[in-house]
Amino acid sequence: MTKKKVVIGMSGGVDSSVAAYLLKEQGYDVIGVTMQIWQEDKEYEEREGGCCSLSAVDDARRVAQKLDIPFYVLNFRDSFKRNVIDYFVDEYIQGRTPNPCIACNKYLKFDELLQKAKGIGADYVATGHYAKIEERDGRFQLIRSKDDRKDQTYALYNLTQEQLEHTLMPCGEFTKDKIREIAKEIGLDVHNKKDSEEICFIPDNNHGRYICEAAPNKVRTGNFVDKYGNVLGKHKGIVYYTIGQRKGLGLALGRPVFVTDINPVTNTVVVGPEEDIFKTDLVCKDINFISIDKLEDPMEVEAKIRYSAKPAKATISPMENGRVKVSFEDKQRAITKGQSVVFYKDDLVVGGGIIESLL
């Protein structure tokens, strides 16, 4: 019997490294691939660059050698720039706060990488994500990982049935601590490599400065205003702010104020008291459902409005033109346009969409 072939995306981190090992142990024919997506400066043009750093490629290659699996570096730079970086910059300029990891998963890892994998005769693509995929009643389900603290299903809600059928996520059955333990046991140097926290193409985490450099003619100073339109001061460009932000506003009003809205048309940033950033209802677009085909009637779920949020009780209701209304039982802090909202039923991911407006 021929072994099933799987292409695993390797970032040089501990999760994808151990995922590659686990798949090999499970009897798969494993091929390691690092997606070359980014270069910080000219040296990456001349040399073999990688996912934000040369060392990531080197780490991944060393792991592949240790596991004795073939390893390739694939160039995804143009696609990454088009689908992730340009999208990220445009969204901020429109006054929204996007999640680039979700775009990267949707367009690169589980679309283009999967197509490339199929092109070389592979049955599956695999990643080091903390999530589980199971077939139940003829439908592939995305299920929260065993490690609640590390669960990454929020960033994976766009997966289609076709993609789920051809995707493996072996880390979903383990806790992060156990994954590190396995890495140490099998002698991988990356066993104590720290988790990446920031956006991979903005290592200093300064989004505003990055967008200014990427689109200097699009970022203009403007006014801070209150909800009645009274001018309270000057801001340095709407891309520097996000809903709920309090620090770094440079306003001395004698009371704490928070960013409550961003208006790209008037180039204003609205600030107000903290209670103004608590809301219960939103509308989302670009919906993808996983556990169901489509939403016919209102459904009670738990929903997350950002990666780090706790799931909160909500009702989702179908609207016109494919949108979904989400009504939370309790007010949520700083619901942010451009972020994703993801729906859960127990451990199952029902689906999700991008927050378009607040009601």
UniProtKB/Swiss-Prot annotation:
- Membrane as a keyword? no
Q: Which organism is it from?
A: Clostridium perfringens (strain SM101 / Type A)
- Gene3D superfamilies given in the database record: Adenine nucleotide alpha hydrolases-like domains (2.30.30.280), HUPs (3.40.50.620), Translation factors (2.40.30.10)
* Predominant cellular place of this UniProt entry's protein: cytoplasm
Keyword Metal-binding, does the record have it?
no
Give the enzyme's main class according to its UniProt record, as a single word: transferase
Family of the protein in this entry: Belongs to the MnmA/TRMU family.
- Give the SUPFAM superfamilies listed for this entry: Adenine nucleotide alpha hydrolases-like
Q: What does this protein do?
A: Catalyzes the 2-thiolation of uridine at the wobble position (U34) of tRNA, leading to the formation of s(2)U34.
Keywords assigned by UniProt? ATP-binding, Cytoplasm, Disulfide bond, Nucleotide-binding, RNA-binding, Transferase, tRNA processing, tRNA-binding
Entry binding sites for ATP: 9-16, 35, 128
Q: Name one GO cellular component term.
A: cytoplasm
The UniProt entry annotates the active site at 104 (nucleophile), 200 (cysteine persulfide intermediate)
Task: List S-S links within the chain.
Answer: 104-200
Q: What is this protein called?
A: tRNA-specific 2-thiouridylase MnmA
CDD domains named among the record's database cross-references: MnmA_TRMU-like
What ranges does the record give for the region Interaction with tRNA, renumbered to this chain? 150-152, 306-307
Q: Which GO terms describe its biological process?
A: tRNA wobble position uridine thiolation
Q: What positions are marked as the site Interaction with tRNA?
A: 129, 339
Could you state a single Gene Ontology molecular function term? tRNA binding
Q: What is its EC number?
A: 2.8.1.13
**Catalytically driven reaction(s):** S-sulfanyl-L-cysteinyl-[protein] + uridine(34) in tRNA + AH2 + ATP = 2-thiouridine(34) in tRNA + L-cysteinyl-[protein] + A + AMP + diphosphate + H(+)
Q: Which domain of life is it from?
A: Bacteria
Q: Where in the cell is it found?
A: Cytoplasm
